[in-house]
Amino acid sequence: VLEFYQNHTDCFAIKSLEEIPSGLNWKDGLGEEEFSSPDAKRGGTWNVFMRDFPRTLRTIGPDANGAFRSYLSDYNALSLVMSHPNSDGYYPGLASSWAVADDRKTVYFRLDPDALYSDGQTVRASDFFFLFYYMRSKHIQAPWYNDFFGKDKFLKVTLFDTHTFSITYYKAKPDVAERVSLRPVPEHFYGELDGEYLNKYQWLPEPTTGPYVATPENIDKGKSVTLVRQNDWWADQKKFYRYRFNPDKIKVSVVRDYNKAFEIFLKGEIDMFGLAKTEFWYEKLTDKNQLVKNGYLSKVTFFNQTPPPSYALRINSQKAPLDNQDIRIGFHHAMNFKLVLEKIFRGDYVRMNTVADGYGARSHPTLQARTFSVEKA
């Protein structure tokens, strides 16, 4: 590991605290509004389903990008700073404070000294050195991550002490604090990687900074994985976290057929079922259903202004005839999205105008999707 750092001194540096620029505007996000409810009840088991059993408990590498990965990573582990759901600001994650340099490319972080992994080890600034050693390693067999965390995007990591470091992004961004808000990789857990990485960690979950852990004794191969909440989770009583992550356990069971899962949901053996398909909302579970009328099931539609996934028709513009912009514009005008939304989705969906909607002031204020028009097409 040390040899890797020494061979890439353009990407990794160690400096003293005195070398941190003066005059930085340090923020801690504690002025943001708390968005969780003190009335939330803690305890019990949250029962959900997945369509297939995970092929590994690794979150990186072959077979790791399945549906269950989110329960270990996205829904659970903390990043340096967290995007506030109701404002354009950030609240503390693993970092207790942060500051953006004048170049809008470098962000300085101070780790929360309370931050721990689930194995009790302290989160250290050096784990962000190790993050890049890990993500750039050939042994993880993950070309996408090798590329994403490459030195052409993340230019440099600089350590100042055990809890203070900076990350330099490749270009200035208005949301650069979020761009470099990464999750650490615990060096004490992995050490130097080798060709045994995939097999060694196939069913050995990485220590997490989040509240829930997956342990071998809570895995029923082929049937379910149960995540258990840590009783002594380090962020349990901190603002923005104290009224969240309330179930004692999250049981994720395998139900391969979507219709079968719906039947199990109606029996009360699954606690939540997405009704995104219109036939489920309007036909299979109408408002007149006795389970709904008697209050046993709640049908809820959420409206939000958060960034949606970049759903789009992807066009390969490198080859003829789609390398012609006029043809691509005509293709746009030939797409009758309004008809699709009205007939298939019954008016419940709204067409995005760009691939970056929902970013508040950062989204384009006037750009509109091209309308359906046979004449223009």
Residues covered by each model-derived region:
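N-terminal lobe/hinge region of extracytoplasmic solute-binding protein
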Residues: K15-S16, G23-E34, G44-D102, Y133, ...
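Short, solvent-exposed loop/turn elements at domain surfaces
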Residues: P54-P62, D88-Y91, S118, D175-E178, ...
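Surface-exposed binding/hinge segments that line
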Residues: A40-K41, R110, Y145-D194, K200-W203, ...
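Short, well-ordered beta-strand elements
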Residues: G43-D52, S96, T106-Y108, L131, ...
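Aromatic- and charge-enriched surface segment that lines or borders ligand/interaction sites
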Residues: S97-Q141, S166, A261-I264, P321-N324, ...
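Gly/Pro-rich hinge or "lid" segments in bacterial periplasmic/extracellular proteins
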Residues: N65-A67, Y71-L78, M82-N86, S181-K249, ...
